[in-house]
Regions:
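Metallo-beta-lactamase
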Residues: 24, 108, 118-210
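Active-site neighborhood of phospho(di)ester-bond hydrolases with catalytic His/Asp-centered motifs
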Residues: 28-31, 49-59, 76-81, 114-116, ...
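Conserved beta-strand hairpin/beta-sheet module of binuclear metal-dependent hydrolase folds
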Residues: 1-48, 123-133
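Active-site HxH/HxHxD metal-binding segment of metal-dependent hydrolases
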Residues: 12, 33-110, 190
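Glycine-rich, flexible loop/turn motifs
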Residues: 2, 92, 98, 141-142, ...
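Short beta-strand-initiation
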Residues: 1, 11-13, 91, 97, ...
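Short Gly/Pro-enriched turn/cap motifs at secondary-structure boundaries
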Residues: 6-7, 93, 113-115
Length: 211
């Protein structure tokens, strides 16, 4: 087992490199922009073959950068079924849905459909670790992000993510209140006041905050 966070020096973005050292196969989740050389160096250092580039989500504004690592390795880009991609990326991408399993070496990553921040958002569950992208970014709904859907986000949090074990370690694409990792139990307690209301109440609350 090998786990290496990838921190962008010029943004708050965080990516993650996972590997099976025995089988020398790896995947990378949400590699930050301009970190391709670093990822390649880490792969070379341990003689790893990159199998997949896993994206939790792709915003229209930065879609062009989504396959940079795939262009210089044999890795396959993996995105959600509803992810917006430029045509040159879309032809090569593997689109996956909730319940899919991705294998690298003897390791398995489970795919969870977690729409809300964007329609095509995915989360990836590996061992006791959840890589959730911006699935907990409630602020994007209240701020009026056009790709965000508060109803879908409510469903994702209450029916999918918060049904996982409380000890699950959550690794986001951006720090959550300054933290790079939290347990699911901690996040459940933090978000409880907003999620104790009904789905319609949550949507209304988000829409009112946009005003």
């Amino acid at each position: 087992m090998y786990f290496h966070p990838l921190h962008s020096p010029d943004s708050s973005l965080i990516g993650y490199l996972l590997a099976d050292l025995d089988e020398q196969e790896a995947v990378v989740i949400d590699p930050p922009p301009r970190q391709t050389e670093l990822v390649l160096a880490l792969l070379t250092e341990r003689s790893l073959r990159l199998c997949h580039v896993l994206r939790t989500h792709v915003h229209r504004a930065d879609a062009a950068d989504c396959s940079a690592l795939c262009d210089c390795t044999s890795a396959r880009l993996v995105v959600g079924e509803a992810a917006a991609l430029p045509q040159d990326c879309s032809r090569e991408a593997m689109r996956v849905a909730h319940g899919a399993r991705l294998v690298f070496g003897n390791e398995v990553v489970r795919v969870l459909g977690t729409p809300g921040h964007t329609p095509g958002c995915l989360s990836y569950l590996w061992r006791d670790r959840l890589f959730c992208g911006d699935a907990f970014d409630v602020g994007s709904c209240s701020a009026g992000n056009r790709e965000a859907d508060p109803g879908l986000l409510f469903d994702t949090l209450t029916r999918r993510l918060f049904t996982l074990p409380e000890q699950t370690l959550v690794f986001p694409a951006h720090p959550i209140r300054g933290r790079h990792v939290a347990t699911l139990g901690e996040l459940r307690a933090r978000y409880a006041p907003r999620l104790q209301q009904s789905r319609d109440g949550f949507i209304t609350d988000m829409m009112q905050r946009r005003a």
